[in-house]
A protein has these predicted regions:
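Conserved ATP/PPi-binding loop(s) of AMP-dependent carboxylate-activating enzymes
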Residues: 343-347, 356-388, 424-426, 519
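Conserved AMP-binding A3 loop
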Residues: 33-35, 163, 172-196
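Gly/Ser/Thr-rich phosphate-binding loop
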Residues: 233, 258-263, 272-336, 349, ...
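Conserved pre-ATP/AMP-binding loop-to-beta segment of ANL
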Residues: 5, 20-21, 136-144, 154-176, ...
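Structural core segment of the AMP-binding/adenylate-forming
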Residues: 51, 78-149
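AMP-binding/adenylate-forming catalytic domain of the ANL superfamily
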Residues: 484-506, 522
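AMP-binding/adenylate-forming catalytic core of the ANL superfamily
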Residues: 90, 96-97, 261, 372, ...
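Conserved AMP-binding/adenylation subdomain of ANL enzymes
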Residues: 195-212, 220-260, 274
């Protein structure tokens, strides 16, 4: 591999001379040859400078995958600015936070999820970002035709001056990590890193690479951007569609006979299930680049079995590495491609490291660290102690893995995803690989959940193939033959589908929230079945205690959605009981304890004291309070234990089909 000190502008100028009429990008009828792309981006870059955008200014780019998106991206960089790539699936408020985080001064936008719901979404984003309307430009095909720039006579000398002296290693791109904190990290990438990472990645399959690719990866994410950059560098043709839908992808492959494809596992699975897959996809596709989360061996083998003429190439990386760090090759065996994430890219370094032992030997597990030409320039506006590249230049990925004797990288988990159960470290990936071997399982994700005894429990989320049923007992029996008993999931949660991020990757945080909610519901159901004790209050035998107790119970009754009328009735019954025990007891009752319990059918309020046994229906002097209590309770009973302690229970059934488990699970 030859590392190149080059830029997008120099690549375009070269290709415009070598193959001017070859189509570079095409999406939904908007196609640009290399000569057109070079000319149009020069003109647009000049206009961008005319908008008042200066070198190194941060400029936001927001829209679905399309040729015009890439035209705008190239033009921003040709103008010497920094392209801030926004996720087309995020709501306006979240985007405004990212705009503020990165100090973006201008918005270029096209069609996206928000504008499809609200035509004023871009205006609202500008307002939230404190930008005037003249700091916005709509590049969508419906709003603007870049082909008009082919006849534009604007002076592009300022652009030429910038591109001729442009430093390939400067900050040129900001891409956001899909983090779990309130705000993602803003990763600063260079043209040098993205272009050379693409070259290194492409070298892994250069002899098998076709003349065109159907790219389904979002270009606002590093993998999608790197792939299209590679195909641009090699003068290939990139086909796109705004919406990553199976029917649209099938149309592209069928129409243009694209031999190469790029996508995440969910996209390939959806294509397999498309009715025209056999006649419109299989005949053309030969190379399938797969990104996103790590593919299990069984999953990748199943896909390759379905794509009968294609080879699936697995890889690994992260945004901070532009992003690829390793990649498999078509000449690798299916076993190697399925069980590893490929061998290292030429020119880069990967080692396995632990804090305790330093660099590890072949086959030993530790954190994957990387060093080389593809690394980011850093996180924007984060101090040194929060950067993930150490003083020796090693990027700490946060992923666990090992390198085998053939120099292939194997991932065993993510440090933050490791489940710690009773002091044992458990890798979710190990369990997932065994679960997915079951023929009924389409997708699986194993996660940890808080547990009061073992610290964490092992929980599995699964998606079934259509028409398949899940036998949990059989699955557990099967797993007992493959993994240690303590690693077997406590529960299997079945989903119709997993939530996805805008780039098609699994929304792991969203899935975990759903799983934890369902787990909470299961645990609540167990507690509610036996009676869930939620409050105990003890008061003196004094009429002054009545009001605060009523206030407590009234507030609680309203909180759990009893109607105002029913709440008043509950309070009347409680008041009658308190007054009877406090004011009219036959003997000294001492302190009174009031407890609230929740059951599936009702709320139970219990009163306990040392007074004489009290049957409201038998005592002549308690008729009025008895009538009040019996009028409003759903059930009533009184008991006395062996020590002579009396307990009076009043049940109040839930209203209008209210489900206490669902209610508490949402809290």
């Amino acid at each position: 591999m030859t590392i190149e000190e080059t830029t997008y502008a120099k690549i375009l100028a070269k290709k415009a001379k070598e193959c001017p009429d070859r189509v570079a990008f095409c999406s939904e009828g908007q196609c640009y040859t290399y000569a057109e792309l070079d000319k149009i981006t020069d003109v647009f870059a000049a206009k961008i400078i005319g908008f008042g955008i200066k070198k190194n200014d941060h400029v936001a780019l927001w829209g679905y995958n399309c040729a015009n998106w890439f035209v705008t991206y190239l033009s921003i960089i040709k103008a010497g600015a920094v392209a801030v790539l926004l996720n087309y699936s995020l709501p306006v408020k979240d985007l405004a936070d990212l705009m503020e985080l990165t100090d973006a001064k201008f918005i270029f936008y096209g069609n996206n999820r928000e504008t499809s719901k609200d035509v004023d979404a871009a205006v609202k984003l500008a307002e939230l970002s404190k930008l005037s309307k003249d700091k916005m430009f709509n590049f969508s095909g419906e709003a603007f035709d870049f082909k008009t720039y082919l006849n534009d006579s604007i002076d592009t000398s300022a652009v030429k001056a910038i591109t001729e002296s442009d430093n390939p290693r400067r900050d040129a791109i900001i891409i956001f990590t899909t983090g779990t904190t309130a705000l993602p990290k803003a990763v600063l990438l260079s043209q040098y890193g993205v272009i050379n990472d693409g070259i290194g990645y492409g070298d892994k399959y250069k002899d098998a690479r076709g003349e065109s690719i159907c790219n389904t990866l979002p270009m606002f994410h590093s993998f999608g951007l790197m792939v299209v950059t590679l195909y641009l560098h090699d003068a290939k043709t990139v086909y796109l569609h705004e919406l990553i839908k199976p029917e649209e992808i099938v149309k592209i492959v069928d129409k243009y006979h694209t031999p190469d494809m790029s996508g995440v596992g969910a996209v390939y699975t959806a294509l397999v299930e498309h009715p025209d897959f056999d006649i419109k996809v299989i005949p053309s596709v030969r190379i399938c680049l797969i990104g996103g989360s790590v593919s299990t061996p069984a999953f990748l083998m199943r896909l390759e079995e379905k794509f009968t003429h294609a080879t699936f190439l697995n890889g690994y990386g992260q945004t901070e590495a532009s992003p690829a760090l390793s990649m498999s090759s078509p000449t690798d065996s299916i076993e190697k491609r399925a069980t590893s994430v490929g061998s290292l890219l030429e020119g880069g370094e990967i080692k396995i490291w632990t804090k305790e032992k330093g660099f590890m030997s072949t086959g030993e597990v530790g954190e994957v660290v990387a060093r080389g030409y593809y690394l980011m320039n850093g996180y924007y506006k984060l101090p040194k102690e929060k950067q993930s590249i150490d003083d020796e230049g090693w990027l700490h990925t946060g992923d666990l893995g090992y390198v085998d004797e053939d120099n292939f990288l194997h991932l065993t988990g993510r440090i933050k995803d490791i489940i710690i159960k009773s002091g044992e470290n458990i890798s979710p990936i190990e369990i997932e690989q065994k679960i997915i071997e079951n023929e009924c399982i389409k997708e699986v994700k194993v996660m940890g959940a808080p547990h009061p005894v073992t610290s964490e429990s092992v929980e599995a989320c699964i998606v079934l193939y259509d028409g398949k049923t899940f036998d949990e007992e059989a699955m557990i029996a099967e797993l007992k033959t493959k993994i240690s008993k303590f690693k077997i999931p406590s529960h299997f949660f079945i989903f119709d589908s997993f939530p996805l991020l805008g780039n098609g990757k699994l929304d792991q945080r969203g899935l975990k929230e759903l799983m934890l909610k369902r787990l909470k519901k299961l645990r609540l159901e167990h507690k509610i079945e036996k009676g869930f004790h939620v409050n105990t209050t003890t008061v003196d035998n004094d009429e002054l205690a009545v009001t605060p107790v009523l206030g407590l119970i009234g507030t609680f009754a309203k909180e759990i959605k009893f109607s105002e009328k029913r709440t008043d009735q509950i309070l009347e019954a409680v008041k009658a009981m308190l007054e009877e025990r406090i004011l009219n007891a036959y003997t000294d009752v001492g302190q009174i304890t009031i407890q609230i319990h929740l059951f599936k059918e009702c709320m139970r309020i219990q009163f306990r004291d040392q007074g004489d046994k009290y049957f409201v229906e038998d005592d002549e002097n308690a008729k009025n309070t008895a009538k009040t209590i019996l009028k409003y309770v759903s059930n009533y009973k009184t008991e006395k234990d062996s020590k002579g302690v009396s307990t009076y229970s009043m049940d109040f059934n839930w209203e209008n089909g209210f489900n206490i488990v669902d209610f508490l699970a949402d809290k």
